[in-house]
Amino acid sequence: KEFNIEKIYSSEEEAFLEKEVVFDIAVPPQVLIEVVKKIPEGSICQLQKPMGNSMKDAQLIRQIIKEKKIIACVNLQLKFSPMMIALREAIDKDMIGQITELEISLSVKTPWHLWPFLETLDNVEVPLHSIHYLDWIRSVLGNPRSVHCKSIKHPSVPKLSDARSSIILEYEKDIRCCLSINH
């Protein structure tokens, strides 16, 4: 009631009995396949990234979605944020000229302890965070020729596989593109 949520379900089974709703599936990647199997045929849903723990997981999830005629998307919302929409418009209108440099530098303190399941994952930073930046960059510059990435631990979160990444995207054009991400 505090947040004006009209209906709360006690289980996913109860929620999946609903008709004419959009399901927002936000579960750890290691259980996503099992949850997708339970989504009713013909439903509409948004899956929070990542789409499983591996390419094999993603392919199986895609297969289940197709077989059950589910309309689905994966949430990569950064490119739809107001600031990125405005930037995209400026780029499209040639207001900032030719893009020759694209660099993202981010240093934040993420409350990783709020998601203890992250400690079980082989990769954390790129599939759960930097993927938003990579998706946005691809929407602006297209697909890179190659990607070089190194993700490492951070001493403040020793139980996570990684929390920092250095990423270089190589393009055919005269574009230098790199990301330095520190959580």
Question: Where are each of the predicted segments found?
Answer:
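Predominantly a Rossmann-like dinucleotide-binding segment in NAD(P)-dependent oxidoreductases
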Residues: 78-158
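Hydrophobic residues in well-ordered beta-strands that form the structural core
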Residues: 47-48, 72-74, 179
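Rossmann-fold dehydrogenase core element
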Residues: 60-78, 97-104
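Short beta-strand scaffold segments in enzyme catalytic cores
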Residues: 167-169
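Short beta->alpha connector loops
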Residues: 28-31, 51-52, 78-80, 152-153, ...
